[in-house]
Regions:
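N-terminal alpha-helical modules
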Residues: 22-209
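Bacterial N-terminal signal peptides that target proteins for export
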Residues: 1-10
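N-terminal signal peptide c-region/cleavage motif recognized by signal peptidases
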Residues: 16-19
Length: 209
């Protein structure tokens, strides 16, 4: 499950319409438990599942990865799936599952080179380096191109998941946390970041290597 310190914003614009075109990486006829069944009925969650599996496969296929590291990655993925399926215990199972997927996507992209090599085939980008004068540390940002889209920011031991909202220009993301409102407005090489209890910061966004 996600660390307790995650600042999980309220998921905005939840999709509940009919006509789910996407399908997850697993066979929905064999879906087990509440979470897998929910994923099969939810277009956004199905896309997140397929993207997570794609990135995991790219990480696992790296020729330079040692046998012991592959075993560790396999164990980590099994543990993550168990944690995702435990989201049935959460007060908002969908928000929990969404956050689990995006956190896993971020970690796969951050920790392995393979998942960053075929972005044209997926729906995620990053992690980008976000440098903000006045911030506690360097911020890493991963972006997810679903409907709605998401921005996932991590720094030190903090994590913040924001949902995309309407904007006249650029890409604006917002979240409601226990501490207050948060906002990240990506305008190309620059972005504006607002965190609860702190003044707005103008940041520079740098593409991953």
């Amino acid at each position: 499950m996600l660390p307790r310190r995650i600042l999980l914003g309220a998921v905005l614009g939840v999709l509940t319409g009919a006509g789910h075109a996407a399908s997850p990486s697993f066979d929905c006829k064999r879906a087990e438990g509440q979470i897998e069944q929910m994923i099969c009925k939810d277009d956004t969650l199905a896309k997140l599942d397929k993207e997570t599996t794609r990135l995991y496969g790219l990480a696992l296929d790296a020729r330079s990865m040692s046998t012991s590291r592959k075993k560790t990655l396999l164990a980590e993925q099994r543990g993550w799936i168990k944690g995702r399926n435990d989201c049935w215990k959460a007060s908002d199972a969908r928000a929990c599952t969404t956050a689990e997927y995006i956190d896993r996507i971020h970690l796969l992209r951050q920790n392995f080179a393979g998942p960053r090599t075929q972005d044209a085939k997926g729906i995620t980008r990053g992690p980008f380096s976000v440098r903000c004068p006045g911030a506690d540390a360097l911020i890493l940002a991963t972006f997810v191109q679903t409907e709605p889209g998401y921005a996932y920011l991590t720094w030190l031991d903090k994590k913040l998941l924001l949902s995309q909202t309407r904007a006249a220009s650029g890409a604006r993301y917002a979240a409601t946390t226990d501490a207050g409102e948060a906002m990240f407005w990506d305008k190309g090489p620059e972005a504006q970041l607002e965190l609860p209890g702190k003044p707005a910061m103008t940041c520079r966004v740098e593409a991953p290597e």
